[in-house]
């Protein structure tokens, strides 16, 4: 699992699939944790473009362990990539087990919101944002990424998001000078720019310059 996460953060789609594929023959449904291996394999297949196989494996993992949020997430990716919006909503709504006690819960709610966004059901998207996505005002970077990217998508579609950017920017502020991970910084920059916090945006840009020179 640690290797799978490393492959994810380095963007190595081939190894996301193949690292798990190599050990899969040594696993079976009689071995505890088999569902987790299938969930990782499903995500690797999806990221490699093998949507049919990825969906099948992901659904099998969830059937074995309904609260496997990573397997749920892998199938959500497939349905999103294929534009299967109604099926995506049904998939996420039909299994409430992923919503409980998981660091991935907010991100999975975000995936559900994307399906509603494609339907231009902005009222539901904003309700999801104000509820399970950002209602708890979380400060984890992975949750702030989801908040920023969803507000950005809404704004690009001309939706008035009110003052929601302000709170997101305030929570990103503690990480503005880190300059450690460009993906995070880009999402922080969205919040700073859209909330008018040019001071934080300047600090973020300077942190990026320092990091690039190291």
Model regions and ranges:
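Helix-turn-helix repeat elements of alpha-solenoid scaffolds
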Residues: 7-22, 43-55, 77-93, 119-129, ...
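Canonical positions in the second alpha-helix
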Residues: 23, 27, 60-61, 94-95, ...
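Helix-coil-helix junctions within alpha-helical repeat/solenoid scaffolds
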Residues: 114-214
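Hydrophobic secondary-structure block in the mid-to-C-terminal portion of proteins
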Residues: 26-66
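Non-membrane alpha-helical segments in proteins
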Residues: 1-9, 39-40
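Generic helix N-cap/helix-start motif at coil->alpha-helix transitions
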Residues: 1, 30-38, 66-73, 101-109, ...
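Long all-alpha helical scaffold domains
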Residues: 51, 65-76, 84-111, 126
């Amino acid at each position: 699992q640690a290797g799978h996460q490393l492959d994810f953060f380095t963007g190595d789609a081939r190894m996301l699939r193949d690292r798990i594929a190599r050990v899969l023959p040594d696993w079976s449904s009689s071995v505890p944790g088999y569902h987790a291996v299938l969930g990782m394999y499903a995500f690797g297949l999806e990221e490699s473009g093998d949507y049919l196989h990825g969906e099948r494996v992901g659904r099998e993992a969830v059937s074995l362990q309904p609260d496997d949020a990573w397997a749920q997430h892998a199938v959500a990716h497939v349905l999103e990539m294929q534009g299967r919006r109604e099926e995506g909503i049904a998939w996420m709504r039909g299994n409430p087990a992923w919503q409980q006690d998981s660091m991935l819960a907010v991100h999975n709610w975000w995936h559900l919101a994307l399906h509603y966004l494609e339907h231009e059901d902005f009222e539901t998207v904003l309700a999801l944002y104000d509820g399970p996505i950002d209602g708890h005002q979380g400060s984890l970077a992975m949750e702030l990424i989801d908040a920023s990217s969803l507000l950005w998508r809404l704004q690009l579609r001309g939706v008035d998001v009110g003052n929601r950017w302000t709170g997101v920017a305030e929570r990103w502020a503690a990480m503005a000078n880190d300059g450690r991970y460009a993906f995070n910084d880009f999402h922080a920059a969205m919040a700073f720019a859209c909330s008018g916090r040019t001071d934080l945006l300047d600090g973020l840009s300077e942190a990026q310059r320092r990091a690039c020179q190291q």
